[in-house]
Amino acid sequence: MPTPHTDIDLALAAELGQQLRVDSVRSSTSAGSGHPTSSMSAADLMAVLVSRHLRYDWDAPDNPGNDHLIFSKGHASPLLYAIYKAVGVISDEELMTGYRRFGSRLEGHPTPVLPWVDVATGSLGQGLPDGVGVALAGKYLDEVPFRVWVLCGDSEMAEGSIWEALDKASYYKLANLIAIVDINRLGQRGPTEHGWDTETYRHRVTAFGGRAIVIDGHDVAAIDRALAQAGGLTGEQPTVILARTLKGHGFSEVEDRENWHGKPLPAEMAERAVTELGGERHLLVRGPVPGEAAPHRAANGLAEVKLPAYDRGQKVATRKAYGDALAALGARPLSLIHI
């Protein structure tokens, strides 16, 4: 693999954003399906995150110190796979010939068949609740200082599960959870409920106990400041970055236009888009990696727990025995997960 850029300034991050847009267009047009415009709106956000803030060892996805990146807007998979190309874990050939093909690991919505994907997403409103679970595990079970970054779409902000997740994140003081909301104003059926009304989103986030940061989602300097502030693990609140963006940003024929959700650009149109975006690029980047942390804590310690005992022949309802055991094990807070 060629030597990647590792000391990435904002100018290079902006170039990376353009590359992610170009590759989102190329891959979806090649596949004949996909969501390029939804990917283009969030490209700058992800370019700055991956190149300057996400602490991740791409060669060791099982490193317990790695940050976690969850695409709650899983339909923006062209963007995620373009990121994987940019960090060198998949090739341009795989991106162009594998995306959305039968039998390929580059599925229409990301799944853990890829070692860098924690959870399968695509059902809107699912990714942030997943992120809360991962953040809980990091803070209370493993006690490892990773951050959980969740990319959300503005359409899914109408889902109740998003707000339930934020409520629980604030209750459990998950400062290690950062949601990035791509407010591009347009959903599958037209304008979203609140459009670009970031003040309404801000009031709702704060009402549920979160810290809101409102930015221009195409200003790489503003993005960089917001990510640095959110990722500092200061305070006790989850952070929600509310980024105003343009769907299809960078290509004038589709930018902020309705009826382009979930539609690949026709071949000739895609060529014009690539030209307007400055042509193909093949930047290779690597951002920060996690520092050497203490091994994560094993949540066992059963010797400290006095389990219920019953006399031979004593009749005990299974649900009561199960409940008694859970109550005893639960005396050690957040040390037990059961289904």
Show which residues each predicted segment covers:
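Glycine-rich ThDP/TPP pyrophosphate-binding loop and its adjacent helix/strand module
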Residues: Y56-D62, N66-H68, R105-E280
